[in-house]
């Protein structure tokens, strides 16, 4: 039975939990779901009187959230947790999660401080202007040190951390937490962490607590003149005033409040949930999203449940029980189950069969999702990641889509057994539907299945999923760069296909002019035939012949791009002409034209951003130059340097390993496809020789 929910945007939090791989993201997430699930059991929130009996399952299999978004409750607030991946090859995954969340918890391992991968996650959150709070986890571990976390946040991230809590005890004697804003202390009476006791701050911690309370008031005064006046007059601001000021500083991206605990030992998680409610933004606190009308006008879309419907699809998942799930965020209006929506990206109408909300271990059917909320839709067939959905009669806006970079690396794949061929094709089609940066095609000459993706790791994971989820074992070739070919001068050619010996003959004759186009233009076909010298029913056949022949260029067999073909003359035979004959004539003509047009090879050029500590900068730049890179510029970010460059993809294989050794594991990089450009002469000769 679908459940209706009382709705208040102020009480909604859409957050991500981001971390270095081993900082304890999963455990933190599990514990959050456990405590919020307990509330369901106690029955304070009557949404569907859901019972989440977690501990049993946790013991059995250590839950890890796989849903793209999981919903839970805390203190009358709904919290949607959006899963964020930890790895850079999945920039699309991170982009897609950063696009739909409003705030984040960044988890650090207290014994390690800020690790290289946490730097990457942090920079991504910065790029999307996501307000965040930090959780210093594993405070019970040997070597745990809150001050290491604070120091490395300042040094490596250039952040302004604000100490919100102090630990009672350290490492294995860690037993409680001091809240320096409210000047209270909490200890735990049991291992589950459910028995929290408020106690006076222990004598030996009082001075330190007062010192940090004072510092907190100073920070708050930066964001609130009223507190500033009180502070100058020696008056104590109220708890509400302090919370409001720290909230404002966090949402304005000026400060990062730091909390602490041990998720594994169930300490500090409820206080972290309080912090999500207190300091992270609701959909009303963030700037409105922008959309574009069909006329190209940019409009702002405000989170109003009574406004026109506008939603963004941010992930597709195949679910064993209900089929294809489309995860969406509603930015405006209300989406109701059973309604029709219009996909403005595709120009298609779709029906919403059912709406689901994912809890950690069950799904709940709901009647509607309102502005600001996230959930999953069952029944959409055409919609993919980055598409915009609007109401049937709502204005046809398109939301800024999630940028989907072009795949740049190709690998040939075949099933280990012939019997698996059909299974492999179906599995690849399913995976391509889920992940817009993954493509499947057939090589025009060898007939091999080619899979294309964003990087080596990306394709390794796809192959791994084939085995695990679809039970298909596959052999894969070596990764190849997706080259292209084109011409550099205009040419005029004719193609004749004439066979006239006994019986019905073949007759097709065309004259074409072929010209180079600017990079990225693709293919343009112009029909300039006048006076019916070629009957119009044969024109599409000529175009088809040309397009098919362009799949394999004369130099190294890669597709030909960026040309304009004008069909301007030719002739036909009353009896012997056929579509087939004109198709062959077209293909003969274009093959000759490309040969004569001084063909060149184009290679994908990547926009590479390397983040490295200052001291390794010289080495990193030297290495990029050696890889035929073109340095575009540098900028400090925190106290690292970001180097931007264009580098040919062919030179980037194995770069992750090289960069790690050059920067002792502290450098990180992201790369996106930017454009194709002509390869240098000596590289072209090498490629042709290597054929």
Curated annotation (Swiss-Prot):
InterPro entries with a match to the protein in the record: EFG_II, EFG_III, EFG_III/V, EFG_IV, EFG_V, EFG_V-like, EFTu-like_2, G_TR_CS
Annotated residues for binding of GTP: 19-26, 83-87, 137-140
UniProt main location, coarse: cytoplasm
Record Pfam families: EFG_C (PF00679), EFG_III (PF14492), EFG_IV (PF03764), GTP_EFTU (PF00009), GTP_EFTU_D2 (PF03144)
Family of this protein: Belongs to the TRAFAC class translation factor GTPase superfamily. Classic translation factor GTPase family. EF-G/EF-2 subfamily.
PANTHER family: RIBOSOME-RELEASING FACTOR 2, MITOCHONDRIAL, TRANSLATION ELONGATION FACTOR G-RELATED
Name the record gives this protein: Elongation factor G
Gene that specifies this protein: fusA
């Amino acid at each position: 039975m679908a459940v209706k929910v009382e709705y208040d945007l102020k009480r909604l939090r859409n957050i991500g939990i981001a971390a270095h791989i081993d900082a304890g993201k999963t455990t933190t997430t599990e514990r959050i779901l456990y405590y919020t699930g307990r509330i369901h059991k106690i029955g304070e929130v009557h949404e569907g009187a859901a019972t989440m009996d977690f501990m049993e399952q946790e013991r059995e299999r250590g839950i890890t959230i796989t849903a793209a978004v999981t919903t839970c409750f805390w203190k009358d607030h709904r919290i949607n947790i959006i899963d964020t991946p930890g790895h850079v090859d999945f920039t699309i995954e991170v982009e897609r999660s950063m696009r739909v969340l409003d705030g984040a918890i960044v988890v650090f391992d207290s014994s390690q401080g800020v690790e290289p991968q946490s730097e990457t996650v942090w920079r991504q959150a910065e790029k999307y202007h996501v307000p965040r709070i930090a959780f210093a986890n594993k405070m019970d571990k040997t070597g745990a040190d809150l001050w290491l976390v604070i120091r490395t946040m300042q040094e490596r991230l250039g952040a302004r951390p604000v100490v919100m809590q102090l630990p009672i005890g350290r490492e294995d004697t860690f037993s409680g937490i001091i809240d320096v804003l409210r000047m209270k202390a909490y200890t735990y009476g049991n291992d589950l962490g459910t028995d929290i006791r408020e106690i006076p701050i222990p004598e030996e911690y009082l001075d330190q607590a007062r010192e940090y309370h004072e510092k907190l008031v100073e920070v708050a005064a930066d964001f609130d003149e009223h507190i500033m006046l009180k502070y100058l007059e020696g008056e104590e601001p109220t708890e509400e005033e302090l919370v409001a000021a720290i909230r404002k500083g966090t949402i304005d991206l000026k400060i990062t409040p730091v909390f602490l605990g041990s998720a594994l030992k169930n300490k500090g998680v409820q206080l972290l949930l309080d912090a999500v409610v207190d300091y992270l933004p609701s959909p009303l606190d963030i700037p409105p999203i922008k959309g574009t009308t069909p006329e190209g006008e940019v409009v702002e879309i405000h989170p109003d449940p009574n406004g026109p419907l506008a939603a963004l699809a941010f992930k597709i998942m195949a679910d064993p029980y209900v089929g294809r799930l489309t995860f969406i965020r509603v930015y405006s209006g209300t989406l109701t189950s059973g309604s029709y929506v219009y996909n403005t990206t595709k120009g298609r109408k779709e029906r919403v069969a059912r709406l689901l909300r994912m809890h950690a271990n069950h799904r709940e059917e709901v009647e509607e999702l309102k502005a600001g909320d996230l959930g999953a839709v069952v029944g959409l067939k055409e919609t993919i990641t980055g598409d915009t959905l609007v109401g049937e009669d709502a204005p046809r806006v398109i939301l800024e889509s999630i940028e989907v970079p072009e795949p740049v690396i190709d690998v040939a794949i075949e099933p280990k057994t012939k019997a698996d061929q059909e299974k492999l094709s179906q599995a690849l089609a399913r995976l391509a539907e889920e992940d817009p940066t993954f493509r499947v095609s057939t090589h025009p000459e060898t007939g091999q299945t080619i899979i294309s993706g964003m990087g080596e790791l990306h394709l390794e994971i796809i192959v791994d999923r084939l085995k695990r989820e679809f039970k298909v074992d596959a052999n894969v070739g070596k990764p190849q760069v997706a080259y292209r070919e084109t011409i550099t001068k205009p040419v005029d050619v004719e193609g004749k296909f004439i066979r006239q010996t006994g019986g019905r003959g073949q007759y097709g004759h065309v004259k074409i002019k072929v010209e180079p186009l600017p990079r990225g233009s693709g293919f343009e076909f112009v029909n300039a035939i006048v006076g019916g010298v070629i009957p119009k029913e044969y024109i599409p056949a000529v175009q088809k012949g040309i397009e098919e022949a362009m799949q394999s260029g004369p130099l190294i067999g890669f597709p030909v791009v960026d040309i304009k073909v004008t069909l301007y003359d030719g002739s036909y035979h009353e009896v012997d002409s056929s579509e087939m004959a004109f198709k062959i004539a077209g293909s003969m003509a274009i093959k000759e034209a490309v040969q004569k047009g001084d063909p060149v090879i184009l290679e994908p050029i990547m926009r590479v951003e390397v983040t490295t500590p200052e001291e390794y900068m010289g080495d990193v730049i030297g290495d990029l130059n050696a890889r035929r890179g073109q340095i575009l510029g540098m900028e400090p970010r925190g106290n690292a340097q970001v180097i931007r460059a264009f580098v040919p993809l062919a030179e980037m294989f194995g770069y992750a390993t090289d960069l790690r050794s050059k920067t002792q594991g502290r450098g990180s990089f992201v790369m996106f496809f930017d454009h194709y450009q002509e390869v240098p002469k000596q590289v072209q000769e090498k490629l042709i020789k290597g054929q």
